[in-house]
Amino acid sequence: MRKKDLPDYVPTYIEDQAKEQRLDQELEIAQAVQKTFLPSRVEKLTGIDIAGICEPAQETGGDYYDMISLGKNRMAIAIGDVSGKGIQAAFYMTFVKGVLHSLSALILSPLELLNQLNRLFKENATRGTFVSMIYGILEADKRELTFARAGHNPMLVVRANGDAEWLMTKGIGVGVANSLLFMKGTEEYTLKLNEGDVAVLYTDGITEMFFFFF
């Protein structure tokens, strides 16, 4: 390297290093936000076992799940994935969580709640940003889960006898369409659960990992 080239080389190197450090800091912030807003404990329901886990990849996205106690042996259950990565996805995840916690006790129809979330998200989110989500209300006394699927991965139900089924209910992602189209394109469904049945909700991290290894 010629000496006269050094001044041009050093600033570029420093700029690249600063950019890398900034991205690392953003990743740490996004991971901290994600951990903070995931449930730290799960309220117990009589006769129902509930568990959740989130293991972030190297690049934190907008994966989100929640369990919100509604009293009377009922619980609101949500799982979603905000498009994008990093701080922006984490920010919109906090927005979604805030809306769900504000409305879950007031709106007992999962479809209508998602419709309101869709309206608020479209009004506040950057154009092109969306959320895939399953939101439902689990009534332990009835062993019923009434839910709506807004463009999210289909729920997997494994029955006690070993039979399995994918619940491919129709639905449009939150933030994709206006309220009229969202309501027309999304349906509410009630799943009847028997003793020993298992319902599995997940984000696309599971499917991406499956394709990566297999």
Range-by-range predicted roles:
Residues M1-P11:
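CheY-like receiver
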Residues F212-F213:
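Hydrophobic alpha-helical signal peptides and transmembrane signal-/tail-anchor segments
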Residues T12-V200:
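… and, occasionally, acidic/histidine-rich disordered N-termini of signaling adaptors
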